[in-house]
Amino acid sequence: MNENLFASFIAPTMMGLPIVTLIIMFPSLLFPTPKRLINNRTISIQQWLIQLTSKQMMAIHNQKGQTWSLMLMSLIMFIGSTNILGLLPHSFTPTTQLSMNLGMAIPLWSATVFTGFRYKTKTSLAHFLPQGTPALLIPMLVIIETISLFIQPVALAVRLTANITAGHLLIHLIGGATLALLNINTMTAFITFTILILLTILEFAVALIQAYVFTLLVSLYLHDNT
């Protein structure tokens, strides 16, 4: 039976119940926290990457914004590990679900906006009306800026969903083409297989880049409101 092209994006269920929550928790179960101090190359590289990313992401923030550093680092590690685990064969990637990405984007965006209105009310309200706007354009610009503000979490979620989904679809299509060409032309099948390997390597990079971009945009929203 031929598998539907989008079958891998359907949320799996067990006995009629969704098991997305278990899949989301899987990275933490796969990499448990050691009970004693372990210092090896893997841990050293992991700590170096976390420190480097944290330093770059937190450099623009004031003291109030830097209190979000633990949450932002946890976010980038969660999205990155979820994306990479989703590249394994016969696995499911939760970040291909727009509902899940909206579930991450909307609360984070709402928290940054709430922080801005709580601590910098005048500055936050000033974002709705750029300085030097002609009086005739004030009503239209306020509406446009309000719409652009509420589009931010949607764009954040759609960007992550689209990039991860597109990569998985390309791998699925090229993999299917490689299998189909094995019985037709071995040389062409070898070329498509080489393309598949290169695309898989690219998808590993995209998985990490999209995690960084998602977290960086949340960090920039926070910077605008602190």
UniProtKB/Swiss-Prot annotation:
Membrane topology category: Multi-pass membrane protein
InterPro entries: ATP_synth_F0_asu, ATP_synth_F0_asu_AS, ATP_synth_F0_asu_bact/mt, F0_ATP_A_sf
Annotated GO MF terms: proton channel activity
Bilayer-spanning residue ranges: 6-26, 68-88, 97-117, 136-156, 164-184, 189-209
Catalytic activity annotation: H(+)(in) = H(+)(out)
One Gene Ontology term from the biological process aspect of the record: proton transmembrane transport
Similarity remark: Belongs to the ATPase A chain family.
PANTHER family attached to this UniProt entry: ATP SYNTHASE SUBUNIT A (PTHR11410:SF0)
Annotated protein name in UniProt: ATP synthase F(0) complex subunit a
Native source species: Sus scrofa (Pig)
Gene name for this UniProt entry: MT-ATP6
